[in-house]
């Protein structure tokens, strides 16, 4: 079934199909002369469909022949995808030959039915102190890493992948949505070096790609993850960055002539976000644990894009620029970050009480900061002074050397088990470590390392 191009406006292509059945919404069309795929978005009348190009529209001209494939974009799935890099159409882009995959699946699929869903209470240990204590992850849950430009979303994401993918021996899928090509390259070699590349499928649609690619690349990665889940596996699904998915949707929406809504976003923002997020879920067959980086424009968490994402997550890890400015990394805010798992019935009363004790101390310190700035420490009561000292130790103990940052810091990373994290913070809260200098807590792993550092300072 052939049609011809009648209008080209950037990545938006109008195709006329005379006297034939019109392609369905989301059908893939092929411009054979240029090997370009288009995806149908609208039927505009007079036998014309409006499609978005999944690649550059350079070289297209009116009158070119277009064929209808009769189905949505399909991508390879299953074990042959592991260790390979794909583009949005499922073509390998790592110069390692074709993918020998028997099976292909369309990227547009319905979310699992309500009665197929399964909730999990099992915790997923990450080895990062602040996350395991304050906003623990659930196996099969959804986590968002929120942060502005340059506060460490990608580094935190890479550290979590390294820690979880190495400790958890299952398969992972990584979708690079609208991020820098350099980061994708670094990530590939990082995976290769740590020996987990043969368990990861990578799908990239970088910043330089047209909006159609960036809008659909997350669905390509998700389709690969869903296939593994439906085989009965526990899958890790990483998205960096879900905001770029929203942004690509905004661009496509404007190109298709829809009226923008708040702050210029597409009117279908929450529906598009819901469509992808409802598919990232765990069923009775298998689980998808998803970690998504979310860029926060101008550090404003009330912006419609991050605000819409919040509603879908089980845990939110909020990165704070003011913490990064004090030189404490990871710059995760223990007062802003939340998790549904931080419940005494899930994590146990010891963990819950320790986490809340830490948050209370830090909150009180935050309230006292204004008084300290105006009057100085001397005006505080003895009790408040010791509370401030403990809070500062907690802030520094939250810092931690990362494995993936070794190239920058020259220091080996630390994986801190949850029980060690709890032991350390309980000792700080109880006042056992009041005589240890606060610099000993900076970039230490567990509490034993802090005590060793303190000994060196004394000597």
From Swiss-Prot:
Localization per record: Cell inner membrane
Gene3D superfamilies: 2.40.10.170, Bovine Mitochondrial F1-atpase, Atp Synthase Beta Chain, Chain D, domain 3, P-loop containing nucleotide triphosphate hydrolases
Matching Pfam families: ATP-synt_ab (PF00006), ATP-synt_ab_N (PF02874), ATP-synt_VA_C (PF22919)
A GO cellular-component term linked to this record: plasma membrane
Assembly: F-type ATPases have 2 components, CF(1) - the catalytic core - and CF(0) - the membrane proton channel. CF(1) has five subunits: alpha(3), beta(3), gamma(1), delta(1), epsilon(1). CF(0) has three main subunits: a(1), b(2) and c(9-12). The alpha and beta chains form an alternating ring which encloses part of the gamma chain. CF(1) is attached to CF(0) by a central stalk formed by the gamma and epsilon chains, while a peripheral stalk is formed by the delta and b chains.
Similarity remark: Belongs to the ATPase alpha/beta chains family.
This protein's name: ATP synthase subunit beta
Source organism per UniProt: Hydrogenovibrio crunogenus (strain DSM 25203 / XCL-2) (Thiomicrospira crunogena)
Gene: atpD
């Amino acid at each position: 079934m052939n049609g011809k191009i009648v209008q080209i406006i950037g990545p938006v292509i109008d195709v006329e199909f005379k006297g034939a059945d019109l392609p369905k919404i989301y059908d893939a069309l092929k411009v054979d002369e240029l090997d370009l795929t288009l995806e149908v978005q609208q039927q505009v009348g007079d036998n014309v469909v409006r499609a978005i190009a999944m690649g550059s529209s350079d070289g297209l001209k009116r009158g070119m022949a277009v064929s209808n494939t009769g189905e949505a974009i399909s991508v390879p799935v299953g074990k042959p995808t592991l260790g390979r890099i794909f583009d949005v159409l499922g073509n390998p882009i790592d110069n390692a030959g074709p993918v020998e995959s028997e099976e292909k699946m369309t990227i547009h699929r319905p979310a699992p039915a309500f009665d197929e869903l399964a909730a999990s209470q099992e915790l997923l240990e990450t080895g990062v102190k602040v996350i395991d204590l304050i906003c623990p992850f659930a196996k099969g849950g959804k986590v968002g890493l929120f942060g502005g430009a340059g506060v460490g979303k990608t580094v935190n994401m890479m550290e979590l992948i390294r820690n979880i993918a190495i400790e958890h021996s299952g398969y992972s899928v990584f979708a690079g949505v609208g991020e820098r090509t350099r980061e994708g390259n670094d990530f590939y070699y990082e995976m290769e070096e740590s020996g987990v590349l043969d368990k990861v499928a990578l799908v990239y649609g970088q910043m330089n790609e047209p909006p159609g690619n960036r809008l659909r690349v997350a669905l390509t990665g998700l389709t690969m993850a869903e296939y593994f889940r439906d085989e009965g596996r526990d899958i890790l699904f990483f998205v960096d960055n879900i905001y770029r998915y929203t942004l690509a949707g905004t661009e496509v929406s404007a190109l298709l002539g829809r009226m923008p809504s708040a702050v210029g976003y597409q009117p279908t923002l929450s529906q598009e976000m819901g469509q992808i997020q409802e598919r990232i879920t765990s069923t009775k067959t298998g689980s998808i644990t998803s970690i998504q980086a979310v860029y926060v424009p101008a550090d404003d968490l009330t912006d419609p894009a991050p605000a819409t994402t919040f509603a879908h997550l089980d845990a939110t890890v909020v990165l704070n620029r003011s913490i990064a400015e004090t030189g404490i990394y990871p710059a995760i805010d223990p007062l802003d970050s939340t998790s549904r798992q931080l419940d005494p019935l899930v994590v146990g009363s010891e963990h819950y009480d320790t986490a809340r004790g830490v948050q209370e101390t830090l909150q009180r310190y935050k309230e006292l900061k204004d008084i300290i700035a105006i009057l100085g420490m001397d005006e505080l009561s003895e009790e408040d002074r010791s509370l401030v000292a403990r809070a500062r130790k907690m802030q520094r103990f939250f810092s931690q050397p990362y494995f993936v940052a070794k190239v920058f810091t020259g220091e080996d990373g630390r994986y801190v088990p949850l029980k060690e994290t709890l032991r350390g913070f309980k000792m700080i809260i109880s006042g056992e470590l009041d005589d240890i200098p606060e610099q000993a807590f900076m970039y230490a792993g567990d509490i034993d390392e802090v005590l060793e550092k303190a000994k060196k300072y004394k000597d």
